């Protein structure tokens, strides 16, 4: 599957996607701008890939500086094995679940550079995968799904500075959505966001919220993101330092995530109650990177509707068995979603499965257990002498 993007299936509440992110458009008036932003949410129209020669950035959308954003060492996983080249295949599935509306969005692009008309280097394959879990409406999730990849490919530092570019794309998307909401109040909503970029052997995951990415490394679950919950000690300290509070597990008693894009309509979230910036809810993503090796089998990305009922290792075990049976990431993502619904997930459920190898995951060989004697050599001699005496 080279690229997928979500469209609704009204009969069963599930979705699959077709189309590409839109070209950024210029506009000269507020009404025209609102129309442009509204067009972005029309899932039925055909969308063209970004072309660098046609990119026009609105004057207010200046690049957000992220020079102070870094990838923390504790969230960096390195595995040095050369000569491995990932062979990506992806599949995605989404279901409305027990909710009255679908607020999730996702994007899978197995050939990211080519899809956006960019020249690829000799670094190897490039791919982009994203899951966006909206709340209070679908608009923020759909906006992030369209705009994060757009800002990535527009950035002059892409792909040489992937970490900085990915962080900047989240923050620019948040700023752009604020402008969109100021032009059309009906767009007011928020979304968590997780984006994974594969470039050569480098996998970079940016997360803001409680979507999660889990890598299967020889059947072992490697979490490539951390859930940003208000009750997390690190997030709680940051929230309280920004003038917010955590009540009953909710940020300011209203939101069950500590990081998200949008939510500008919620008082005291993106701005402090005194009107100053840097409120307790931030869109800044947390990044994790790793170098892929032949031990890495597949990546699972899911919204919290998946992880509410799956432990990370449990999901890897489940997906691994399915891929061993059919080696089809689309079927595997569908089976993950269906299993989450069977386990009574109460949310929209979206899963993306990215296979990193052409062949299915191999059977794991259990290590042979070493036999430890419970008797010393002297004790064995004494026992043998005793048994010999019984025979006489």
UniProtKB/Swiss-Prot annotation:
UniProt entry keywords in alphabetical sequence: Hydrolase, Magnesium, Manganese, Metal-binding, Protein phosphatase
GO cellular component, one term: nucleus
Name of this chain's protein: Probable protein phosphatase 2C 22
Similarity section: Belongs to the PP2C family.
A Pfam family recorded for this sequence: PP2C
Cofactor comment text: Binds 2 magnesium or manganese ions per subunit.
MF-aspect GO terms: metal ion binding; protein serine/threonine phosphatase activity
GO biological process: regulation of defense response to virus
The organism's place on the tree of life at top rank: Eukaryota
Start and end residues of each PPM-type phosphatase domain: 89-356
Cofactor: Mg(2+); Mn(2+)
